[in-house]
């Protein structure tokens, strides 16, 4: 997607005048690392609740069969934000958008930390999910601030912040909860997010906006009326017209349903006898996500060699097999750790491949395509979270394992069905 400067930005510099950061000059050294930190912190808020589900369910007297709604509402909020808020990054001044959303995210986190009852908790968590999509806007901001020759490194740094945030979220949540109670997790995050908003307000220049659908400069809402609605609708239109986008989106839905089935459901068997683990220990299992970071690099290299379809097949086969050791959680924590490593490796391999393949369909619409794709991701995460709780209530951990394996097998069968399509779908 082409980027152009708004206001007075030109070839001599960014919006601040000659020598200011912009597409033709590197941003200040502190900006990209600060964006990476803010991205990781924002995305982490979506995953804080996973090791705390048992505690939250008891504290707010939630039915065990519905405790997964805590994660489900957060993910549904995130999906709504991807569709409704992320497109604003191509219409409004990103500095104001990023810092404003971070400020509102801090208030939503404060609402979670101070929630007096279940209804207030669930509303605040949905707001957290809605506003956490600011991470996607910050990725686009990093790209817009960096010249093409250095853009890949900048985006890679910021995306690395997202992976790190996901990786550390569960562990940090568990440690803080054990040290100071579950509310401290959200109150500390609220304060940290507010500080990041202030720092970015000072560090970011008035940044760029993108071209609108069809290549014309994007309009500001209210400029000619209805531009925001048309921009959102254009994302839906892209997926309606391109079969590959729908197939890869469905794969994302199934893969992340399996992912969420594990990480939402695993708190229950780990907190119950014979393990009776603390929140810290439960959160530490999230560190198995380090395998996901490794998988992202491997999958990227395979995709560059034209092996996207094979990478997808291998990843989905590993995903199915990962549920064999996961099913032995009641007997061995080592089995769970091994299964979690395999699952996270497989999920990230498929996820990176999906994004590589779909971006190539319409590179000029890359932001809208990735945003639309991430809606499938969030819907799958919400489905897995709710399904995991219902499955555990119905048949315990064996039923949760069966559900996760079913999502994984469905994804593998969908991929196998595409092998006969012409032209190939990635």
What is the role of each PLM region?
Residues 156-202:
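Helix-loop-helix hairpin linking two adjacent transmembrane segments in secondary transporters
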Residues 190-212, 414-418:
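C-terminal membrane-cytosol helix-exit motif in multi-pass small-molecule transporters
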Residues 309-354:
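C-terminal transmembrane helical hairpin of 12-TM major facilitator-type secondary transporters
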Residues 81-93, 295-308, 392:
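Helix-to-loop junctions at the C-terminal end of transmembrane segments
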Residues 125-162:
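Cytoplasmic helix-loop-helix junction between adjacent transmembrane helices
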């Amino acid at each position: 997607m082409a980027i152009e400067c708004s206001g007075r930005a030109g070839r001599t510099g960014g919006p601040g005048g000659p020598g200011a950061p912009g597409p033709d000059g590197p941003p200040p050294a502190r900006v990209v690392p600060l964006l990476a930190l803010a991205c990781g912190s924002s995305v982490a808020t979506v995953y804080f609740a996973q090791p705390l589900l048992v505690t939250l369910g008891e504290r707010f007297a939630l039915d065990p069969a519905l405790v997964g709604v805590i994660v489900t509402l957060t993910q549904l909020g995130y999906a709504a934000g991807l569709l409704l808020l992320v497109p604003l990054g191509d219409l409004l001044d990103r500095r104001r958008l990023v810092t404003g959303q971070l400020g509102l995210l801090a208030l939503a986190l404060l609402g979670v930390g101070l929630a007096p009852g279940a209804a207030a908790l669930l509303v605040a968590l949905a707001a957290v999910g809605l506003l956490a999509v600011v991470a996607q806007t910050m990725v686009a901001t990093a790209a817009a601030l960096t010249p093409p020759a250095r853009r890949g490194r900048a985006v890679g740094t910021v995306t690395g912040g997202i992976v790190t945030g996901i990786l550390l979220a569960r562990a940090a949540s568990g440690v803080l909860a054990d040290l100071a109670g579950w509310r401290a997790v959200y109150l500390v995050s609220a304060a940290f997010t507010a500080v990041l908003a202030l720092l970015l307000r000072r560090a970011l220049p008035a940044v760029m906006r993108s071209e609108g659908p069809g290549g014309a400069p994007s309009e500001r809402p209210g400029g000619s009326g209805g531009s925001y609605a048309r921009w959102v609708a254009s994302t839906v239109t892209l997926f309606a017209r391109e079969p590959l986008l729908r197939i890869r989106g469905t794969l994302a839905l199934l893969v992340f349903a399996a992912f969420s089935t594990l990480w939402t459901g695993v708190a229950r068997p780990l907190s119950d006898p014979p393990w009776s683990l603390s929140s810290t220990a439960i959160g530490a299992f999230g560190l198995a996500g380090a395998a996901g970071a490794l998988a992202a690099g491997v999958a990227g290299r395979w995709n560059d060699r034209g092996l996207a379809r094979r990478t997808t097949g291998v990843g989905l086969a590993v995903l199915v097999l990962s549920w064999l050791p996961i099913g032995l959680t009641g007997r061995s924590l080592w089995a769970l750790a091994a299964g979690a490593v395999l699952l996270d490796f497989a999920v990230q391999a498929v996820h990176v491949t999906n994004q590589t393949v779909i971006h190539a369909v319409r590179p000029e619409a890359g932001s809208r395509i990735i945003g639309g794709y991430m809606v499938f991701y969030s819907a799958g995460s919400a489905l897995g979270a709710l399904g995991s709780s219902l499955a555990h209530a119905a048949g315990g951990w064996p039923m949760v394992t069966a559900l996760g394996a079913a999502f994984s097998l469905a994804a593998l069968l969908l991929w196998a069905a595409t092998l006969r399509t012409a032209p190939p779908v990635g």
